[in-house]
Amino acid sequence: MFVILNGSFGIGKTTVASLLARAIPGAAIYDPEQVGFVLRRLPAWMLGLARRPPDYQDLAIWRRLIAQGARRKHRHASVVIVPMAFTNPDYLDGFAQALGATAPVHLLCLVAPLDAVRARLTERANKEGREITEFEFRRSQECVEAHRAPNFGIPIDATREPAEIVADIQEKLRL
């Protein structure tokens, strides 16, 4: 089984994914951002591009690699939890379809008001001794606005404590 844990940048996907993985025997986390971080370091010409798009999610190679990686992870884990901030419904749908040939896919989307997401981002930045970045500020707004649409997964209220969110997910998925 795959659990795609979509949600805004800074909404708590990583925290919820970690708690969920600990709560489900045989579960593991697969983080597509790691693939994006690697691709971001490569020069555009290595990716066959004249210039790099601003978002690595726009790279077709990223979308292919994350599906391959998640399927490989599934060989070693009964449940693969995938935390990722998808804002393009076509990319999310393509990813879910690629995984669906391997195992059942559950799409969940952590949702919260923009002010709650930005408060979390500010708190995180303060703990790290820095200011919230322009990227974090802009990306949080893009995500919150996009995730109001119904095609990003079953909405999960992320204004609650992480343990409550995990319990809700387990109940919804009967885990």
Where are these regions (language model features)?
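P-loop (Walker A) phosphate-binding loop of NTP-binding proteins
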Residues: S8
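ATP-binding Walker
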Residues: I11
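Conserved phosphate-donor/acceptor-positioning beta-strand/loop module used by diverse small-molecule
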Residues: A101-L121
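Hydrophobic anchor at the beta1->P-loop junction of P-loop NTPases
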Residues: L5
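Small-molecule kinase domains that catalyze NTP-dependent phosphoryl transfer to phosphate-bearing small molecules
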Residues: N126-D168, L175
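Glycine-rich phosphate-binding loop used to anchor ATP phosphates in small-molecule kinases
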Residues: Q57-A103
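Conserved substrate/cofactor phosphate-moiety recognition/catalytic segment
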Residues: S18-I66
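Walker A/P-loop
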Residues: T14
